[in-house]
């Protein structure tokens, strides 16, 4: 069901914000692959499965220049929380990376051919109360969605 819904939303050029499984779904549906188990297949050097609670940061990501994430935050790094065992392995051809963890995992992506299709591997919805930067991610999505709705 989710892949069919995503296909419809992308064809309709509606704003998309994919979080955790959402970034993974975006990547898989657009032709990318996933690590099914980071510890077995990738051997991370960052904490990607922090213990609860998830309202604090566990590692930083490096933000790629000339990307929507850089435009939203206007900084080079961001501290993020992390609680996943799957992640992007091979990036889908249509997606562009916006941030990487220090051990090289893609942590944020966007689809440049669409108005607003963004994915984050971390959980900004769990940390935004303690981090204005994560709140900015939602404010940006709401602003774009509102503009899209009014068009």
Where are these regions (language model features)?
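Catalytic beta-strand/loop cores that center a nucleophilic Ser/Cys/Thr
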Residues: 65-113
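C-terminal alpha-helix
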Residues: 140-144
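Active-site glycine-centered loops adjacent to acidic/histidine catalytic or metal-binding residues
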Residues: 20, 84, 123
């Amino acid at each position: 069901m989710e892949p069919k819904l995503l296909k419809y939303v992308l064809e309709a050029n509606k704003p998309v914000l994919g979080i955790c499984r959402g970034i993974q779904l975006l990547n898989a549906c657009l032709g990318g692959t996933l690590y099914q188990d980071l510890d077995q297949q990738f051997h991370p050097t960052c904490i990607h499965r922090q213990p609860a609670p998830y309202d604090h940061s566990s590692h930083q990501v490096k933000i790629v220049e000339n990307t929507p994430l850089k435009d939203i935050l206007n900084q080079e790094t961001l501290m993020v929380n992390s609680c996943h065992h799957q992640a992007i392995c091979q990036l889908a051809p249509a997606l562009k990376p916006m941030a990487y963890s220090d051990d090289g995992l893609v942590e944020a992506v966007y689809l440049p051919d669409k108005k607003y299709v963004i994915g984050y591997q971390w959980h900004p919805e769990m940390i935004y109360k303690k981090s204005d930067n994560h709140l900015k991610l939602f404010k940006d999505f709401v602003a774009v969605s509102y503009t899209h709705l009014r068009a």
